[in-house]
């Protein structure tokens, strides 16, 4: 019985491998037929737009569906975009009087780059009146250089990582990156987040003195949404 199960598992692996090889070959212009299997195979094909290719080839720093310079920027993966994101956007716009641009980073320092399928799936979530941009700026200090005089919508958990030395070469290096927020006139609207079953807001974060005046917290009474995109993905799966 154990031997038969192993053989069945090997057969399944071989078929999956053949499917992957076939798709890779076809994407490179070669013919390689899919194996004959009982299951229905659905293939979603995404052809990269020329602007996406330019971004990944470092020909441009960002691409956007809006010709105006972004002022209020909401970085995130938006996988998926949910009601909490929309509420944050609305509150930030009311607070600043600015129009939000959602920012999706195609290449984060601590994550694999987004696939073209993931890029299309993310962009397709936004409504026609919503602005978005795809960037190559993984660090907030890089975003600051790319979009000076901007306000960033940020969760308290993300802001904690911005001030965490382990993401830098040294304390001096961290402070050099943080100084760029002053150099490029960057401000932050900080929304509270649930971290390890505790609600963390701006007042719980040790913000360096040199930019403490650039951070404005949104009170928990105005916004609290403990649902995360990760939890939504787990529920959907």
Cite the ranges covered by each PLM segment.
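Ampiphathic alpha-helical segments that act as solvent-exposed interaction surfaces
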Residues: 13-33
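Phosphate/dinucleotide-binding and metal-coordinating scaffold of catalytic cores
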Residues: 102
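Active-site cores that bind ATP or allylic diphosphates and position pyrophosphate for catalysis
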Residues: 35, 42-43, 49, 69, ...
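Short, hydrophobic/glycine-enriched beta-strand segments
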Residues: 70-76
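Histidine-anchored nucleotide/phosphate-binding helix
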Residues: 81-96
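Non-catalytic propeptide/linker segments at domain boundaries
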Residues: 28-67
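Single conserved hydrophobic/aromatic residue that forms the stacking wall/gate
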Residues: 1-14
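Amphipathic alpha-helical segments that form well-ordered structural scaffolds
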Residues: 19, 23, 88-91, 125, ...
